[in-house]
């Protein structure tokens, strides 16, 4: 008994002074001896409330040792009073103190569990109910129960809202028993079915669409709900532990939304009808390769000159319909770059290129995270099932976040609790974090992003560009392997080289793709507003010993009809007009400022259409 008590002393000190809440109270170590235990002298006195006659019979060193063990002075005084006798041995007092601890240990442990979940944002009554049903030891079961309660509350609130807001004509909106609606869900893709189901459960369409995109097309309903819940938990965690000035700002924003937003009426319109598998008209090593477009290109849009326009796939409602209507009503080709590399990048492409005899640039990229970055395998936990990264963004996770994750994981020597796993996985998917050490996650560096996007090493490095600008430029760029696969059909058509009008060039993704396809670029007229990006393209042009002409414009407005006609007369016309709008106003990661094609950057699409029409009009005149 005494020997196990000595071991318990060290365990108590860890709980009282350490960060870990996961303490193993069981031990088989019976080799410790009380004779080896030394009291540390320290001038600590118990409170004056203890009787003087008792205090005088206990040495200061003994009292100090009890305090160092973590016992309060009030508890020590009480133990001394109860054991007051002729002998007054310290061992008897220690036994009494341990009895006090044992009686409060269970309630203290239970309180820690309750406080843990309340801090994560769960209601106290839900936590208590879950612990009554599942006990206080199985954290995973408690977490699942709490998530279930949250979903039930959401569904109930959604149903209440429907009763209060909607008239009889809207009653069927939230009824899954409707035969027509069931048929529609059965005929739609897995993503569409999950999206509709989540909307019926009361989730915002934006949140649901982003979660589905992040989790992947094959994710189950449970995985998507877990992702949304983890996102909500993370937001609540940030609000709880935010610095005072940030917390006040969050609260003010909440109040502002409460007073300014009007209730949203349920909307049955689709964001956009995206294919279940984003393989476009076909991708390498995948069945379903098409030899002909499902909807032929209108005669008025046939090339040459050819054109190629890219934008993000997940856009606000109606955006792709508007893009298509301005580009000769050509049906978009939606492709996810995960079929070409280890990172997803869902994009839509409208072009008039042939689709037969496409080929992949060599060597092809590695297809999984572990193949692309083999050093991560050693540290990758079994509960992180990712093989692909999500879309590469223009910003990265903060060092504070990765530090917070490391601290959370280091609290547990054994199996990481399910709730912690879910939170970590949410942050990993959101920020594309990879494992670089034990319990250590890090965002991709710019060199790794270059590799995934298909650019040559150090393509964006040096030349005065900052790390922040590198991330921004890479996040808005083409995925070279994907674009090269589409442009590969041009190689046999232009054996003597090609003239390119490159609009919103960025860091030269289109030019890199043509170079890797070994298609000679006779002329490239580039329009790019960023000085850093223009420097990157110019450096690439020089380092790859291009023999053609590179002519640069900073302002797209300078490319009026007269300038375009003069350039075409000078260079003999353009064979390819390539471009794409930065995704700042369209992408889910920037949803707070998302305004569709009317945004500051995405409205450049209309300049693309204006210039393309001028090029095609001049080309018709030149052919006469």
From Swiss-Prot:
Uppermost EC category: transferase
Region Disordered, residue ranges: 160-189
Keyword Nucleus attributed: yes
GO molecular function, one term: DNA (cytosine-5-)-methyltransferase activity
E.C. number(s) listed in UniProt: 2.1.1.37
Residue ranges that the Swiss-Prot or TrEMBL entry lists as coiled coil: none
GO terms (BP aspect): defense response to fungus; DNA methylation-dependent constitutive heterochromatin formation; methylation
Extra remark beyond the main annotation: DRM2 is expressed at much higher levels than DRM1, which is scarcely detected, suggesting that DRM2 is the predominant de novo methylase.
GO cellular component, one term: nucleus
Catalytic activity entry: a 2'-deoxycytidine in DNA + S-adenosyl-L-methionine = a 5-methyl-2'-deoxycytidine in DNA + S-adenosyl-L-homocysteine + H(+)
The protein, known as: DNA (cytosine-5)-methyltransferase DRM1
The protein's role, per its UniProt record: Involved in de novo DNA methylation. Controls asymmetric and CpNpG methylation. Required for FWA gene silencing but not for the maintenance of SUP gene silencing. Functionally redundant to CMT3 to maintain non-CpG methylation. Involved in RNA-directed DNA methylation.
Assigned keywords, A-Z: DNA-binding, Methyltransferase, Nucleus, Repeat, S-adenosyl-L-methionine, Transferase
Domain SAM-dependent MTase DRM-type positions: 291-622
InterPro entries: C5_MeTfrase (IPR001525), SAM-dependent_MTases_sf (IPR029063), SAM_MeTfrase_DRM (IPR030380), UBA (IPR015940)
Biased composition (Acidic residues): 166-185
Subcellular location: Nucleus
Location of the UBA domain: 57-100, 108-149, 188-231
Keyword tRNA processing set for record: no
């Amino acid at each position: 008994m005494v020997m196990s008590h000595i071991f318990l002393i060290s365990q108590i000190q860890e709980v009282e002074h350490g960060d870990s809440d996961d303490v193993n109270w069981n031990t088989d170590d019976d080799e410790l001896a009380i004779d080896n235990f030394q009291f540390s002298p320290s001038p600590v006195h118990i409170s004056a409330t203890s009787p003087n006659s008792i205090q005088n019979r206990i040495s200061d060193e003994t009292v100090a040792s009890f305090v160092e063990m973590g016992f309060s002075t009030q508890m020590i005084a009480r133990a001394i009073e109860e054991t007051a006798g002729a002998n007054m041995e310290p061992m008897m007092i220690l036994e009494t103190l341990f009895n006090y601890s044992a009686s409060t240990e269970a309630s203290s442990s239970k309180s820690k569990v309750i406080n843990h979940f309340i801090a994560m944002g769960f209601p106290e009554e839900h936590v208590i109910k879950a612990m009554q049903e599942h006990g206080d030891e199985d954290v995973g079961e408690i977490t699942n129960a709490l998530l279930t309660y949250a979903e039930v509350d959401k569904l109930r609130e959604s149903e209440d809202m429907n009763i209060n807001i909607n008239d009889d004509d809207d009653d069927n909106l939230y009824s899954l028993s409707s035969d027509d609606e069931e048929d529609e869900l059965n005929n739609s893709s897995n993503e569409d079915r999950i999206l509709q189901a989540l909307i019926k459960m009361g989730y915002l369409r934006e949140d649901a669409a982003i979660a589905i995109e992040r989790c992947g097309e094959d994710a189950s309903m449970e995985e998507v709900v877990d992702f949304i819940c983890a996102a909500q938990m993370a937001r609540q965690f940030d609000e709880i532990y935010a610095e005072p000035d940030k917390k006040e700002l969050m609260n003010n924003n909440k109040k502002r939304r409460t007073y300014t937003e009007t209730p949203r009426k349920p909307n049955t319109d689709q964001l956009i009808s995206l294919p279940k598998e984003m393989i476009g008209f076909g991708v390498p090593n995948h069945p379903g390769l098409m030899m002909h477009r499902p909807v032929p290109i209108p005669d008025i849009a046939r090339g040459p000159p050819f054109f190629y326009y890219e934008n993000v796939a997940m856009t606000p409602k109606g955006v792709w319909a508007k893009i298509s209507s301005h580009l000769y009503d050509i049906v978009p080709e939606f492709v996810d770059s995960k079929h070409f590399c280890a990172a997803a990048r869902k994009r839509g492409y409208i072009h008039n290129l042939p689709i037969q005899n496409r080929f992949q640039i060599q060597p092809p990229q590695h297809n999984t995270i572990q193949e692309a970055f083999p050093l991560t395998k050693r540290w990758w936990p079994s509960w992180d099932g990712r093989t692909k990264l999500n879309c590469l963004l223009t910003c990265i996770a903060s060092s504070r976040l990765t530090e917070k994750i490391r601290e959370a994981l280091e609290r547990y020597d054994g199996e990481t609790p399910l709730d912690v796993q879910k939170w970590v996985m949410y942050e990993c998917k959101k920020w594309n974090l990879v494992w670089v050490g034990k319990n250590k996650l890090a965002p991709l560096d710019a060199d790794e992003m270059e590799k995934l996007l298909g650019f040559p090493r150090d393509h964006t490095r040096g030349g005065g560009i900052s790390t922040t600008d590198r991330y921004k430029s890479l996040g808005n760029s083409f995925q070279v392997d994907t674009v090269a696969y589409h442009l590969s059909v041009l190689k046999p058509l232009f054996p003597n080289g090609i003239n390119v009008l490159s609009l919103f060039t960025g860091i030269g993704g289109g030019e890199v793709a043509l170079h890797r396809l070994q298609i000679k670029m006779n002329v490239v007229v580039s329009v790019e507003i960023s000085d850093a990006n223009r420097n990157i393209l110019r450096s690439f042009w020089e380092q790859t010993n291009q023999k053609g002409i590179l002519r640069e414009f900073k302002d797209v407005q300078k490319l009026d009809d007269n300038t375009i006609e003069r350039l075409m007369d000078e260079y003999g016309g353009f064979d390819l007009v390539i471009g794409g709008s930065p995704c700042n106003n369209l992408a889910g990661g920037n949803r707070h400022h998302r305004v569709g094609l009317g945004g500051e950057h995405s409205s450049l699409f209309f300049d693309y259409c204006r210039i393309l029409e001028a090029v095609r009009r001049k080309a018709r005149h030149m052919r006469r």
